Amino acid sequence: MSKQRKLTEADVTPESVFYQRRKVLQALGITAASLALPHNAQADLLSWFKGNDRPKAPPGKPLEFSKPAAWQAQLDLTPEDKVTGYNNFYEFGLDKADPAANAGGLKTEGWQVRIDGEVAKPITLDIDDLIKRFPLEQRIYRMRCVEAWSMVVPWIGFELGKLIKFAEPNSNARYVAFQTLYDPEQMPGQKDRFIGGGLKYPYVEGLRLDEAMNPLALLTVGVYGKTLPPQNGAPLRLITPWKYGFKGIKSIVHIRLVRDQPPTTWNQSAPNEYGFYANVNPHVDHPRWSQATERFIGSGGILDVKRQPTLLFNGYAEQVASLYRGLDLRENF
């Protein structure tokens, strides 16, 4: 049996971000020999479980929500401190602990979201309006990162499709485009490309309209019974549990119904690595690592990290497979 090749930082980190990190370290005069751990997804995971200076999320406000039985999956939850302390949110830094450390000052009071485009009723709503208009419910979802780690999270929100129906899309609407807040003063990664991984900001994402209308697609305002902390995408983020986590755009300010497929940030950055669809698929590897298995982040320490098989559509094939009937999932990854 041949030995499995060891993963390097370049193997598990997007190439553009990998080289940005190297530039940052060089600018700071930090050499490889002086680093205790390489800054990549695997090392971030190791340092997290060591418990060194783990950042604490700011306290959230309690939310009122229902718990529909159909959405309370009997799965082992990832502990709250790991859900809120191990994140990708490059607007606040490249390492997993950076968002919790740097996002605490994000101003979310009076936050507004604009819904427009190919709709009969364009409207701007603040976050309180959304919560009052669309009753909240808790849904326990699997979450799978493209970096081959996973969590199980009790999100609180409402179906994206309900908001879309409220805006009354017209016959030209075929896709839904999303945009994150653009505020370099609050989000240092937008101001400094070394901090933000060299991505083009604001962060943008998109779905086909039928994907957006699927009941699984959730506009999320809370987690673990409280409002979202900034590092998790406060005050409003998208959750599409059958897709890789980078599709879950955070801190949304604009939702637009459009005719043509919208650009998406990671697809623009590295189209050979990150497709528009980004459906979880154990049979379609990332060009630099396998997607056949994943590391589940649970309640244990580093020795207890569970490696498990990746499920097609992250275990939600029954609900979403029909959306892609006749579509080559290798070509349309």
Curated annotation (Swiss-Prot):
Keyword set for this entry? Metal-binding, Molybdenum, Oxidoreductase, Periplasm, Signal
Task: Summarize where Mo-molybdopterin binds, as residue positions.
Answer: N87, Y90, E91, C145, T180, N232, R237, G248, I249, K250
- SUPFAM superfamilies recorded for this chain? Oxidoreductase molybdopterin-binding domain
Q: Kind of enzyme, top EC level? A: oxidoreductase
Q: Which GO terms describe its cellular component?
A: periplasmic space
Q: Which reaction does it catalyse?
A: L-methionyl-[protein] + a quinone + H2O = L-methionyl-(S)-S-oxide-[protein] + a quinol; L-methionyl-[protein] + a quinone + H2O = L-methionyl-(R)-S-oxide-[protein] + a quinol
Q: Which InterPro entries match?
A: MsrP (IPR022867), OxRdtase_Mopterin-bd_dom (IPR000572), OxRdtase_Mopterin-bd_sf (IPR036374), TAT_signal (IPR006311)
GO annotation, biological process: protein repair
Entry GO MF terms:
metal ion binding; molybdopterin cofactor binding; oxidoreductase activity, acting on a sulfur group of donors, quinone or similar compound as acceptor
- Compartments (UniProt record): Periplasm
Oxidoreductase recorded as keyword: yes
Q: Name one Pfam family in it.
A: Oxidored_molyb
Question: How does the record describe the protein's post-translational processing?
Answer: Predicted to be exported by the Tat system. The position of the signal peptide cleavage has not been experimentally proven.
The record's remark on the cofactor is: Binds 1 Mo-molybdopterin (Mo-MPT) cofactor per subunit.
Outline what the protein does. Part of the MsrPQ system that repairs oxidized periplasmic proteins containing methionine sulfoxide residues (Met-O), using respiratory chain electrons. Thus protects these proteins from oxidative-stress damage caused by reactive species of oxygen and chlorine generated by the host defense mechanisms. MsrPQ is essential for the maintenance of envelope integrity under bleach stress, rescuing a wide series of structurally unrelated periplasmic proteins from methionine oxidation.
UniProt protein name: Protein-methionine-sulfoxide reductase catalytic subunit MsrP
What phylogenetic lineage does the species belong to? Bacteria, Pseudomonadati, Pseudomonadota, Gammaproteobacteria, Enterobacterales
